[in-house]
Design a protein with these regions (language model features):
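Short, low-complexity disordered leader/linker segments with a strong preference
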Residues: 1-36
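Short, glycine-/small- and polar/acidic-enriched structural segments
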Residues: 31-163, 174, 190-196, 210-212, ...
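Soluble non-cytosolic domains of exported or imported proteins
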Residues: 44, 71-75, 90, 150-151, ...
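Short, solvent-exposed loop/beta-turn-alpha elements that line the ligand-binding surface or hinge
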Residues: 61, 115-117, 216-219, 284-293, ...
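Pocket-lining segment of extracytoplasmic ligand-binding domains
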Residues: 94, 178-265
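Short helix-loop capping/hinge motifs at secondary-structure junctions, enriched
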Residues: 128-136, 165-167, 232-241
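Secondary-structure end/capping motifs
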Residues: 235-306
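Conserved C-terminal helix/tail region of periplasmic/extracytoplasmic solute-binding proteins
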Residues: 301-319
Length: 319
């Protein structure tokens, strides 16, 4: 297995240069005009409270004009943020932690979706006839993950080691979430860590089953992602940052209580079939900005050398 830190080195080095070169400057606006904020995000349920905040007018009520740029990957979002093409972007905790330790001045300004053992949106699946019950049963097997050296690998390697297996013997195969169900069915992989809505589609085929809530090995609750900007942007736009955070927290509270209504909003942005969105487990959004929800991911990532060392979660949060 490739050393996780090596997989990040070139990209992170490029980001450092881009951040230094760009500088974050607020978009000029007339006194009575809303402040434009360019936000990068994927069309995923884990960011759907952003869509809710726009549709419900939470940003507009605070004098913000949030313009979404839908992007295909977290790496693309980070590069755009570093280069000054975005003001705010969504990022998972492992990626942001790695960037922080490389000296890239990214900081979380609002929480995103959290893993919740009572309503998991990412699960480990296996073939329907698989005998897998513990990590030992997966030793030496092929395992599908969305990205190497990231959350989708951190969950299973932690679970495998904590249930009698040896995560270092696993061959982790990077693949799109949408293709994981088919990969299980073909026998290309013996298990996979699948997020919604691909999870719902894979299970509906009847060829796969849930084998474990692998993220439970990290913690029963932890932050999956959040909203980052540069420290320079925070310094120059403190009021806008506070307003953005407040709007996102209001949207989180609304979304957690209104799954059906928020699903209708999400359908406007997602490429997933409407019936899949209706059936899948919806994301749980953090209703407070709590460093304790970030810390388990940082600690586990450091243990498995996905990042160089552990550090206090507060170091990457602008509270």
């Amino acid at each position: 297995m490739h050393t996780p830190r090596l997989l990040r080195s070139c990209a992170l080095a490029a980001l450092v240069a881009a951040v230094v070169a760009s500088g974050s400057v607020a978009r000029p606006a007339a006194a009575d005009a809303p402040l434009t904020i360019r936000v990068g995000a994927g069309a995923n349920d884990t960011v759907s409270n952003l869509f809710d905040a726009i549709q419900l007018g939470y940003f507009k009520a605070r004098g913000l004009d949030v313009q979404i740029q839908i992007m295909n990957s977290g790496a693309a979002e980070a590069a755009a943020l570093a280069g000054g093409a975005l003001d705010i972007a969504e990022s998972n905790v492992v990626s942001t932690s790695a960037a922080h330790l490389r000296g890239i001045p990214f900081t979380y300004i609002a929480p995103g979706a959290e893993y919740n053992t009572n309503a998991p949106t990412t699960l480990m699946i296996c073939p329907k006839n698989s005998p897998v019950k513990t990590g030992k049963d997966l030793n030496g097997k092929n395992f599908g993950v969305v990205a190497l050296a990231d959350l989708s690998q951190l969950g299973p390697i932690t679970w495998i080691d904590s249930t009698g297996g040896d995560g270092s013997t696993i061959h982790y195969v990077e693949m799109p979430a949408a293709g994981m169900g088919a990969a299980i069915e073909r026998g290309t992989v013996d298990a996979a860590m699948v997020p919604e809505p691909a999870l719902q589609i894979a299970l509906a085929s009847g060829a796969s089953k849930v084998c474990a809530k692998a993220f439970d090995a990290v913690a029963p609750a932890f932050m999956l992602n959040g909203w980052i900007t540069t420290t320079d942007y925070v310094k120059k736009n403190p009021a806008a940052v506070r307003k953005f955070r407040d709007a996102m927290l209001d949207a989180a509270k609304w979304a957690n209580k209104n799954h059906k209504a928020s699903a209708e909003i999400f359908k406007q942005y997602s490429k997933a079939p409407p019936d899949v969105i209706d059936a899948m487990t919806r994301a749980t959004f953090a209703e407070k900005f709590d460093p304790d929800l970030f810390q388990p991911v940082i600690n586990a990532a450091a243990k498995y050398k996905f990042i160089d060392r552990p550090f206090p979660a507060a170091d990457i949060l602008t509270l």
